[in-house]
């Protein structure tokens, strides 16, 4: 289903996790004759899962484990993993905070700058442990931190302007 966005842009409808329900079908498919593999920029994966680039979801260990299982974990280029040498105490603070104190805490935590050295370190850790290093960031961050990631890049995805 296409949606008109502005005067000249048409976009596809996307769905969130709370909008999707899986219901068993009327037909049974033998697992031996199915193929769930997919390819992105020459990287083949066997499980059709891309884990969200959220601090509470993907860290170095999760990215490596997902790679080993055949999926893809994406690290948040602008999250706590690249702002703090040890992000675990920060994540513990986020998990423990109440609703009223959440916004001030996030403002405090995200006031720390992203460290290019941590971007490099996290990518190196993932690759050294045998994982596929994938990162996600805003377009501004992609340009700002390209020197921290470009030497590790093995594929280039086209932008909307190139498509």
Task: List the predicted regions and their residue ranges.
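Active-site entrance/lid segments in N-terminal catalytic domains of soluble metabolic enzymes
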Residues: 1-155, 161
């Amino acid at each position: 289903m296409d949606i008109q966005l502005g005067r000249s842009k048409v976009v596809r409808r996307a769905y969130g996790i709370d909008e999707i329900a899986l219901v068993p079908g009327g037909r049974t498919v033998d697992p031996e004759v199915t193929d769930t593999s997919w390819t992105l920029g020459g990287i083949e994966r066997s499980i059709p899962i891309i884990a969200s680039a959220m601090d509470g979801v993907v860290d170095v260990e999760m990215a490596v484990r997902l790679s080993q299982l055949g999926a893809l974990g994406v690290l948040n280029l602008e999250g706590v993993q690249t702002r703090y040498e040890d992000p675990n105490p920060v994540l513990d603070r986020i998990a423990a905070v109440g609703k009223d104190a959440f916004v001030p805490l996030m403002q405090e935590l995200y006031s720390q700058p992203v460290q290019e050295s941590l971007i490099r370190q996290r990518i190196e850790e993932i690759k050294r442990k045998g994982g596929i290093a994938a990162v996600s960031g805003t377009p501004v961050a992609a340009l700002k931190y390209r020197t921290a990631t470009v030497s590790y890049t093995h594929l280039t995805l086209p932008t909307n302007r190139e498509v």
